[in-house]
UniProtKB/Swiss-Prot annotation:
Biased composition (Basic and acidic residues): 333-355, 682-699
Highest taxon above the source species: Eukaryota
Residues annotated as binding Zn(2+) 2: 872, 875, 902, 905
Taxonomic lineage of the native organism: Eukaryota, Metazoa, Ecdysozoa, Arthropoda, Hexapoda
Protein name: Lateral signaling target protein 2 homolog
Function: Negative regulator of epidermal growth factor receptor (EGFR) signaling.
Residues bound to Zn(2+) 1: 856, 859, 880, 883
Cited PANTHER family: LATERAL SIGNALING TARGET PROTEIN 2 HOMOLOG (PTHR46465:SF2)
Positions of FYVE-type zinc fingers: 850-910
Species: Aedes aegypti (Yellowfever mosquito)
Amino acid sequence: MADDKSLLARFYHADRALTAVASELDSFDGRAEPVRCTRLVGRLRQGQDRVLAITNQIMDELLGDDRAPRAFRAKFPEEVLQESLAGQLWFGAECLAAGSSIMNREVESGVMRPLAKAVTKSLDNVRNLLREQCLRNNTPNSLTLRLDINDAATEQLYESLKIFDRLFAEFELLYVSAMVQVKSKQEYEMQELICVLFSETLQRALKIGLLEQEQVDSYDPALMFSIPRLAIVAGLVIFKDGPLNMDQPADNISEMFRPFRKLLIKMRDLLRTLTKHELYQLEKLLCTNEEISLKEELICDANENDSSDVLPQEDHVVIVTTNVNTSNNSDNSDSRVDDSPNDELRHESETRDNRNSSFYSNRIIDSNRLHADVEDDVSENDDDDDPSNVLKDSLVTTDCASGYLIPNTNFGNLLQTNEAPLTDSFIATDEELKLGTSSNARIEQILSETNQKLADSGLGTANPSVDNSPELDTERPITSRSACESSEEGEIDEYDNEEDDEDSDNNLSNQQLMDPGSSAGTSQSAGKPYRTHKQQHHHRHRRSSGSIMSATSSRKYNSKHHKASASASVIVPSNQGTSSKTYSNCDTSPSSGNQSECSSTSSTTGESSQDVAMAIRAAGRIKFKTTENLLHRLFVCIAGVADQLQTNFAADLRQMLKSVFIINSSPPEPEEPPELAPTSSDKPKEPDPTDLFEFRASEQDVITPGQNSGGSSQSIYSAEEVNPEDPHDSVFGSPGTSPIRASSAPRTMMTTAESGGVTVNVSVSVVTGGGSSSSRNVQERSVSLSETSIVVENNGGATDSNLRDSHRRHSAIGSKGEYGRSRSSPNSPVNGTSAEERRMPEAPPRWIPDGDAPRCMACASSFTPFRRRHHCRNCGGVFCGVCSSASAPLPKYGLTKAVRVCRDCYVREVGT
């Protein structure tokens, strides 16, 4: 009967309808009647889909676990896995078996043709056996198959289904692989690693306060853009050995990021030059698109174990300010600027750490290797300014207008705001570096005297072996220089920097960038004017886990003809725990009257090669006027790459993010046992009316620097309530903390932080109503970042009771990322203290999953690789691009900007 719902009955009727369509299609010439042929082919395809769908259900019930595995479908694009896939495969198999070939796939068609014939033959056999079972063992409206297991026909059907299932699976893999590009096993594993990177990035973002757990639990669509952007940053500078390791061959990089390899390498080099604060600003910008502001103070948790999140083994920051005055003087008597009159080499060294740090630089000059090593111990008793001086090598250019290559000069140019080219500053290229002519014997004599006096002063020298080289095997951004070097021809031999091909765009290969731990010396010829320079460094060390060193260096060269000056500052990372500061002062006067003076400051580390490489890459920042410009450029590049993935690998990204959301969602809360009815003696305490609502600051509640708090009737309920849509808010703060605005008294919320004990002093000014124009109370509390509580209280008179009602206490115990985080969101309730009643935003509708909507919910068109799914933000339905082309703001959900909505919702929302 036609209304029989059993599997065998449904198969019987579907097979009869398919046979009728196939017979009609064979009864006429399709070329004579193309319209009729096209219509019948469409009906044939639909009939094949129905027959194979019912056959699959029968195989699931009869074969069970004996079905052929189809794990290879994980390599298929999502667009291929549709309900009509089986029908397309059957149609393709019949075409191949009939002698047709896939366009531009003749070779693959010839390989698949025997398998296609076997598939069609096996399918015909299965259809015949199933028709027999329909007539013999069908039970009307039965939910399961009731076949006689002792019947030979049943056993034959079972074996035929197994053969067909195996052949059809093999043909599916070959046919789909020939029609579309499928992932290889290696690519599939790479994308799994990228999925792991996404998950670790999300966990890190939740930990440092960039994202909130509520967004993950609610499957916030904005995370589909934020997570890939943050993953690019994390994969380049934090999880360096992960899938975004650009040092590995291009074949080992996923196809998702392989087209952007060169761009990613440049981005990696720039990201490594950022400080922890700047990196946090960039990540915050990638999440919120808010304005960049680097002028705010950071509140950092000293106990945070995320030092590897920005730059591994980096806890010190050296701020270097360099002032250079260069001149050329023909008068030898004026070149002496040091106070020391003797010709002896003097060293003043103080011990700051028990660890010794040795640096050397080697150089081949006329087949002779010259080296000078310095090993200083610095005292830990002196934290104030110390003179520092060390003589290593001085590279003087023939034209002083081109500048001198001296330590840290490339760093001084990183953040300079002038438009002057490098040659007009004080970085010289290899071709511009030249020395006066001098004999090798003279150089060796100077070096021997220097080394002898170094040994006499108790300073050790190290052999310049390759094993002790501070350069990395894979990344050598600098070339060390020997002390007081020269050649007979007056030329300096060039060493090419060993860098990746992609790094050559930064012009680092043509710049001789000096190690921060190296120093400068001078080499004069007998027939040229003597050149001297003097450096003075002042260091101040503040003892903290994230200590900041400041240094000022000045070099003066007296001249009648040339004079140049440059000033800049840079932040150079150093290593805590293994770092030691080296200060030395040396004056050298050879017997011939050549005079050279130099003082330098070096920040050395036990494992400084990696830090030096990171610092040298900072030369890429030289093309950016300000740090904001650098962060903006990085934002554009990172967002461009991440957003391009949304187009090129939309299905893969959706699958990855779905897995990430499932993994990182909060576990469901256990059901609480039913509470016992309260007895007369144990009456429930009446709740405080103010505890029924959680007030959040709105735009009118947050006091900005431009507002006048004199007649304001609003109050700030918590210092951590900051509206994210306030245009005055800027992206500032630190990992684990969110920004707290600082404005002028008496309405300021001031924060101070001390690393070490990590004590935060919070000053909150509360402005009360009732016509009072002055702040009632400012209370300071010292709290720990690990257990933060911000309390606003009032001890005034008239408004004491009112303000006590609005007393709120927010605690973030055990969560470093909770302190100061902005909790306001588009869906959070707003403060209702104004005279006008405010409506709380509604919760947005839950999106219908893609798998539950095979067709457009408006026009009922099936989705294809070209007809994509789109969700309406108002009703959550799934529509095609035509039916969801409208956009409108949805203020009831807190969405003030226009978002995608379907046509019906657009008419309804705009009409209302």
